[in-house]
Amino acid sequence: MTPVSDILALLRTDLGDAAGELLGDNDVLRALTRSILAVNRDIGRLYQIAGDDIAPDLSGDDADLVVLRAHAFCCSMLRSAASANFSFGSGDKRVDKTMQAQAWGDLEKDLLDRYRDAVEKIVPPVADCLLDVGNVRPQIFEVGRRHARH
C-alpha cells in the first residue's frame, strides 16, 4: 500500500507549498480524495484511502495521474480563494493581486489538459460510443425476387 503522506508530500512539492502556506492539510487531503475518485472513474481502477494508506498500491503511472489530478483540484481551490483579491495603491506604490485567480485558472486548465492526454494514452477514447467496423457494405435483398449472378 502507498502511504497517503508520500502522495501528499509529492503534491505539496508540485504546488511549491512544502511548508503548507497556500493550503491546509485538510484542503490537500480533500484534493487527493477527489483525485482518487476521478482517476478511478477515468481509468477504471479501484483505489481508496484506507486509514493512512492508499490501497491497492499505486503504480508509478497511476501515482503520477493521481498527483496531477489532485494538483488541478488544488489550483481550483486556490483560484476560488484568489477571486476575492483586489488591487490597491498608495502614492507611487501599487499592489495588484487581481490576476492571481486568472493565473491559478490557467494553471488548472493546463494541468487538466495534461491529465486528459495521459488518460487517453491509457484508455483510448471511443468515438461517440460507436464501434468503427471499417468498410462494411450492407446487403439488400428483396423478398420474392431472384437475383442473377453477374
Language-model-derived ranges and their functions:
Residues 84-89:
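Short, surface-exposed beta-strand/strand-loop-strand elements in extracellular ectodomains
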Residues 99-125:
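Polybasic, proline/glycine-rich intrinsically disordered low-complexity segments
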Residues 52, 90-92:
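Intrinsic-disorder/low-complexity loop/linker signature
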Residues 92-102, 140:
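Eukaryote-specific, cytoplasm-facing alpha-helical/coiled-coil scaffolding segments in long proteins
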Residues 60-79:
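Elongated alpha-helical scaffolds
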Residues 1-60, 121-150:
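Conserved short "hinge" loops at termini or chain/domain junctions
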